[in-house]
A protein has these predicted regions:
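N-terminal leader/targeting segments
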Residues: 1-2, 16-17, 56
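Positively charged n-region of N-terminal signal peptides that target proteins for export
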Residues: 1-9
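Sec-dependent N-terminal signal peptides
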Residues: 9-21
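Eukaryotic helix-grip
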Residues: 22-199
Length: 199
């Protein structure tokens, strides 16, 4: 009887956990609204109640080189200039702190990374996790819904289409009217820093 009740309790916990998981549109090709269509294509859409953004660029690099760079999470602060701090809590869970332009507070988040492959594409997705507790720093706004991923699609042996997708929600005191500009800036910055790191 106790065993049966415990099984029901665990099953309920699993259902609740999955019901609150954020759905990331990693394989969604429709309903994206263009924000910028230069060498770096930046788009967004509201999906599962959140403003998801993505930036796509053709990178002169192999998939293997990009994967090695993206998996080096502990050194993200050396790759992405807006990241002030990146600390591995486990092999796949990382705590990241972001610098924000004055007068806004910094942002931080704890996310867990997951690898997957769909046909020839490599997907490195991430989602906020509470598996490891990290104290909140009053100087930072915790992005509790942080999520997104990297999609790597091979063009040829030396060229890769790289897509970076992220939940554009910034919370805190960041004004809604400035979000679109922030998304465009973030998409351009991230792709530029990736290319710089590969040189």
């Amino acid at each position: 009887m106790i065993h049966s009740s415990m099984n029901k309790y665990i099953y309920t916990l699993l259902i609740v956990s999955f019901s609150f998981a954020i759905q990331i549109p990693l394989n969604v090709d429709t309903n994206w609204e263009a924000l910028e269509t230069n060498a770096i294509v930046i788009q967004w859409q509201r999906y599962d109640g959140f403003p998801f953004c993505k930036a796509t660029k053709i990178i002169s690099s192999t998939m293997e080189e990009l994967i090695q760079l993206l998996e080096d999470k502990e050194n993200y602060y050396k790759i992405f200039e807006r990241i002030e701090y990146s600390k591995l809590l486990t092999s796949e869970i990382v705590h990241i702190k972001l610098d924000m332009p004055f007068p806004f507070s910094g942002r931080d988040y704890i996310v867990k990374y997951t690898k997957s492959n769909i046909k020839n594409d490599f997907i490195y997705s991430f989602e906020a996790t509470a598996e490891i507790a990290v104290s909140i720093d009053d100087d930072y706004v915790r992005l509790v819904n942080a999520s997104g991923g990297w999609i790597l699609h091979p063009i040829d042996d030396e060229t890769t289409e790289l897509t970076y997708m992220w939940n554009g929600e910034l919370l805190g005191d960041f004004p809604d009217w400035a979000l679109t500009r922030a998304w465009i800036e973030q998409g351009n910055e991230v792709m530029t820093w990736i290319e710089d790191a590969l040189e």
